[in-house]
Amino acid sequence: MMSNNLYIVRHGKMLIEDSKKPDYLHLSKEGTDFGLFLDNYFKDIYFDHIFYQSVDIKTSDPYNRCRSTIRGTKGIKTEFDKTQLSKMFDTINKEENGRQNVLLCFRTEAFNVISNIVGTDTDEFFNKDYNRIFHFNFSSNNYNFVKKVNTEEI
């Protein structure tokens, strides 16, 4: 049986105290470099679903813009709110028609929910790692960790 691929992009963290950086992470050198890295890393992959976290004025981290980060990625892009995460994963898991590639770009406040869904051992797995790609294989709501890509090591 072919397994599906889930790539989770954990957007970067900006030091708010650093007044020399631009207001928005995706416009900073760090954010631009990460976006270009993603464009290159995913250049040969077409995604059946690309989910990026919506901007909610009340809860959003103003330094992150997932949509801009994944600008060059090929596939159908859908915005999601963190309250829709569980429902979104249900939809992804229902599609068992062959192989599919799914990309999820999320910001700070969603990592607890995602950790619970994919069943990672600890919140720390997502909590401290910014500008990373996490690759999972999945089938029938069962997620297996494949690898973590650290952009600074490449």
Residue ranges and their predicted role:
Residues 2-95, 110-154:
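Active-site-proximal alpha-helix that buttresses catalytic centers in soluble enzyme cores
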